[in-house]
Amino acid sequence: MNQNNAIGSNPLLMPKPRVALLVNLVAPSREGVYKHLATALDLLILHGGMERNRTYWSRVEVNGASGRRIAGWQLSLTKRERGEAFDHWFLHLEPGYINELVRGQPDAVITDEMGFRTLVGLAYGTCFRKPVWVWWGGTLRTERRVGYFRRLVRKVVARWAKRWISYGRTSTEYLLTLGIPRERILQVQNCVDETWYEAPAEPALNLRPRPLVLHVGRMVAGKGIAELLRAAARLQQEGLTFSTVLVGDGCDSTKLQRLAAELRLDNIHFHSAQPPKAMPAFYRSADVLIFPTMEDVWGLVANEAILSGVPVLCSRYAGCAPELFDPECIFDPADEEQFVAALRRAVRGQLPRADKSRLRSSAEVGDLIANTVLASCAPRRSTKPRVEPDTVQDSVVSN
């Protein structure tokens, strides 16, 4: 990005606005976007602690940004469907955001959910007349069973917040149902740091028989892995031969391995979750990625496979599906017959390679957000030197 064009003809007279980014944790996939934001903005990342199901994530440092971990609590919650555990998530409660915003006096705030953290950001923006963006990823599918209290909070946030950033088309559709005007929504695209996948990498696996069918994701019911195993078993009963590799950890890992044994699946391999930068070698081992999620706000594994040149069979319930894939690559994992037919096409090599041009790079997404923030901050900014709070800035890390 041409920073002079973004912040004016004389950047020495117009310093970067300080922008506080409020997040649960610093996700490795966001590293590229955050780096680009930090080139145009004085970026301060305020984050909570590492979630215990993400311990395989490596330390993340965002060049050009400062950051601080906010003390607080994490509540581990289980989402249930039809009386059974469907997924697990963490509720973050970090009251320290209030103090950090008041002391740091950022020129703008970006927050990535519709809960406590966003209410704090909106309160700060209202009291100090600063713009606040809510960065949102939920879809009509993922939010279909939101409870009464969360619906109430979202009504408050939807009326209060005037600026929004959405993960993509399906997230925008959900925001519109909350009564948020389309002109208030900056639609970007959820993305990964593509530089990891552009670098050469030797395949991590050399398995036979081919093709190698890959699944990457947490071992929980909501990811559709049991449905994948049943569909694979039916194809093997038809006489098709292929290898299946599943990469990930989760509370259902033992249960799924037991199911694979009960189905008498051949050539199936389970691998524990890998550090993000190790994943390009796994994608380069694969002939096709199967993404059978029952609900996902986006599905960054699809981006990763596309960048690796691997065809993708994608669930219709993934937020990324209509934006990244043609209809022949999209299926309903809840329909067993449709799943079997789609997986048969994938195993026979009948899926087209996804179009990389549909992906937005981390630079494009970072520039879209930065330019929007700069445009809103320009009339408000002062050329007086900023007085920094008497605190020590930490490196921005994920734990």
Pin down the residues of each PLM region.
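Short hydrophobic beta-strand element within catalytic cores of glycosyltransferases
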Residues: P311-S315
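A short, histidine- and acid-enriched strand-loop-helix "catalytic/donor-clamping" loop
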Residues: K130-Y148, W160-R163
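Donor nucleotide-sugar binding/catalytic pocket of nucleotide-sugar-dependent glycosyltransferases
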Residues: R154, R159-P200
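Aromatic "clamp/platform" in nucleotide-sugar-dependent glycosyltransferases that forms part
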Residues: M294
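Short alpha-helical donor nucleotide-sugar binding micro-motif in glycosyltransferases
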Residues: A273-Q274, A281-A286
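Nucleotide-activated donor-binding/catalytic signature segment of Leloir-type glycosyltransferases, i.e.
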Residues: K16, Q257-A273
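Conserved acidic donor-binding segment of nucleotide-sugar-dependent glycosyltransferases
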Residues: D326-E337, R344-G349
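A conserved mid-protein helix/loop that constitutes part of the nucleotide-sugar donor-binding site
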Residues: G32, P211, H215-R234, L240, ...
